[in-house]
Amino acid sequence: MSEIKDVIVQGLWKNNSALVQLLGLCPLLAVTSTATNALGLGLATTLVLTLTNLTISTLRHWTPSEIRIPIYVMIIASVVSAVQMLINAYAFGLYQSLGIFIPLIVTNCIVVGRAEAFAAKKGPALSALDGFSIGMGATCAMFVLGSLREIIGNGTLFDGADALLGSWAKVLRVEIFHTDSPFLLAMLPPGAFIGLGLMLAGKYLIDEKMKKRRTEAAAERALPNGETGNV
């Protein structure tokens, strides 16, 4: 159970692919102009990570080490192609919006990195969980960045959600504030870099605060009964 918890915590927070490893920044910065686009690509990446980790882990004993990387890429490309066709069939609006960034999941360092670092060494169930956790960590980072950029840039949230979830999702659109002209800095790549920088700073501050609390708690436990540590 502790290993399962560690895999989940590492993927979602401690070893977050976007905020710690800084992998896959090209789609992270390019696609997160809206929360819907960010969520769509994040979920697609999560599905690819889960399936590729599961497949690579299952076949790890029959994969020659000398040619393992080309085999990994072939497996990843096959899964990405299947996911791309699914999005094209059931979410065509999202497919048009994401464009080239769906097939570019094949070259995403996150996917190849988890295949080599984890799936090739661990069992199928734990590898699938690792892929799901890493993918959801990246999805959360994309969604937060996309939401911030959409709110600041257009004053809306979940604009175009029907492209991802169907016509019923039009009711999810929220207008935070009305604007006649969008704030282009937030919608363009410079806004993505600024937003990512703020998120990195926020994560650092949270980690430092949590570290300080753990240190103080450990110091209090180490004190003899009745002592407070004050002079």
From Swiss-Prot:
Residue stretches spanning the membrane: 18-38, 39-59, 63-83, 86-106, 125-145, 182-202
Top-level EC class as recorded in UniProt: translocase
Keyword Cell inner membrane in record: yes
Family matches, as InterPro entries: NqrDE/RnfAE (IPR003667), RnfE (IPR010968)
EC number: 7.-.-.-
Biological process per Gene Ontology, one example term: electron transport chain
Main subcellular localisation: membrane
Keywords, alphabetical: Cell inner membrane, Cell membrane, Electron transport, Membrane, Translocase, Transmembrane, Transmembrane helix, Transport
Origin: domain of life: Bacteria
A UniProt-annotated Pfam family: Rnf-Nqr
Membrane topology classification: Multi-pass membrane protein
Compartmental location: Cell inner membrane
One GO CC term, this protein: plasma membrane
Coiled-coil boundaries: none
Homology family: Belongs to the NqrDE/RnfAE family.
Subunit organization: The complex is composed of six subunits: RsxA, RsxB, RsxC, RsxD, RsxE and RsxG.
PANTHER family: ELECTRON TRANSPORT COMPLEX PROTEIN RNFE (PTHR30586), ION-TRANSLOCATING OXIDOREDUCTASE COMPLEX SUBUNIT E (PTHR30586:SF0)
Function of the protein: Part of a membrane-bound complex that couples electron transfer with translocation of ions across the membrane. Required to maintain the reduced state of SoxR.
Full protein name: Ion-translocating oxidoreductase complex subunit E
